[in-house]
């Protein structure tokens, strides 16, 4: 550089806190999706570091989070403790669904756009007796049936 400063050649990133769940994404197994205690969902490529990407941090209100800045994130959701993914039709709809610690709702994520989806899944039977389900972690299973 003309001013004597160095240029950034490569930059690696990962979870800021410990990962909670790690699993392969896709049929060929080239990508690994992981969730961490930092409420982030990340994708790591086995093929090349340049294909690694962050799918973002789980937030109750993304718009307010952007306005206030990430360091003052009062809308951050609890850590993702379980998730399921399937790449079938992932260009048409969200392909990942996540369960958060201590919450009865599940959030959707778009792998292609690398963002948290607009959909949340909340079962009505859990809202009728919250004390009964407050310490239960739901299991997520996505089944795609060919038409």
Question: Predicted regions: what is each one?
Answer:
Residues 1-2, 22, 35, 41-48, ...:
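WD40-repeat beta-propellers
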Residues 5, 12-19, 58-64, 73-79, ...:
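WD40/WD-repeat beta-propeller blade N-cap
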Residues 8, 28-33, 41-42, 92-98, ...:
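Structural hallmark of WD40 beta-propellers
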Residues 37-66, 72, 83-85:
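Leucine-rich repeat domain C-terminal region
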């Amino acid at each position: 550089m003309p001013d004597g400063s160095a240029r950034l050649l490569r930059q690696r990133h990962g979870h800021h806190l410990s990962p909670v769940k790690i699993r392969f994404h896709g049929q060929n197994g080239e990508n690994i999706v992981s969730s961490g205690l930092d409420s982030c969902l990340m994708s790591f490529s086995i093929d090349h570091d340049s294909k690694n990407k962050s799918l973002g941090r789980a937030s109750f209100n993304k718009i307010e989070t952007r306005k206030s800045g990430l360091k003052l994130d009062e809308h951050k959701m609890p850590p993702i403790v379980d998730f399921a993914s399937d790449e079938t039709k992932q260009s048409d709809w969200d392909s990942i669904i996540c369960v958060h610690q201590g919450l009865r709702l599940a959030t959707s994520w778009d792998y292609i756009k690398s963002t948290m989806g607009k959909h949340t899944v909340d079962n009505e039977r859990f809202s009728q007796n919250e004390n009964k389900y407050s310490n239960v972690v739901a299991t997520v299973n996505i089944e795609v049936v060919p038409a």
